[in-house]
Amino acid sequence: MKMSCTIEKALADAKALVERLREHDNAAEALIEQTTALNKRVEAMKQYQEEIQELNEVARHRPRSTLVMGIQQENRQIRELQQENKELRTSLEEHQSALELIMSKYREQMFRLLMASKKDDPSIIMKLKEQHSKELQVHVDQITEMAAVMRKAIEIDDKHGCKEQERIIQLEQENKGLREILQITRESFLNLKKEDASESTSLSGLVTSSDLSLRKS
């Protein structure tokens, strides 16, 4: 009777661990969905990188405010991606730690079950081992796949973020050069206006002098 109670308790504990694994699997699926969304955003950023080349071509024809706004928006998008990347990395580490803890407790429960059932029907033990081993293997495979996807997304995001930062620096330098050219153009225009005004004043003086001479004659 005591042996039967021990087995039932061990089975109940094993079932509870399986339920926790299922809950953990749901959380892992949610994390995979977040990773997929992040990959889509990375693809969108790649497309933006292609579009920014077109922006460089027409930058000279756009107002300064438009260029500054584009740079600010790009910085904000990169910061958001980096923050989301950090949160996903933290979630991945937490899920891996939780999986290791659950696996450890599961092995402990299975060991107790085996020790308590040495004199019982070995077919029960084999059936339990096969059932729970299959379920655990499915969860482990899913977590492993999710971790691989996450690492790839993180590598792509980090690499893309560096390239985008270089693009921003290049755009800022081009913007600075455009402003310098604009300033030089304005100064040249003002100098031309001053010279025109000076020439007009001189011409007006000559006309006035000639007119006075004619009147005296």
Curated annotation (Swiss-Prot):
Residues 6-106, 163-188 form a coiled coil. Signal peptide: none annotated. Residues 199-217 have a biased composition (Polar residues). Its main location: cytoplasm. Residues 194-217 are annotated as: Disordered. It comes from Gallus gallus. It holds the Pfam family SIKE. One of its GO terms (cellular component) is cytoplasm. This is FGFR1 oncogene partner 2 homolog. It is found in: Cytoplasm. GO terms for biological process: response to wounding. InterPro entries: SIKE. The gene is FGFR1OP2. Belongs to the SIKE family.
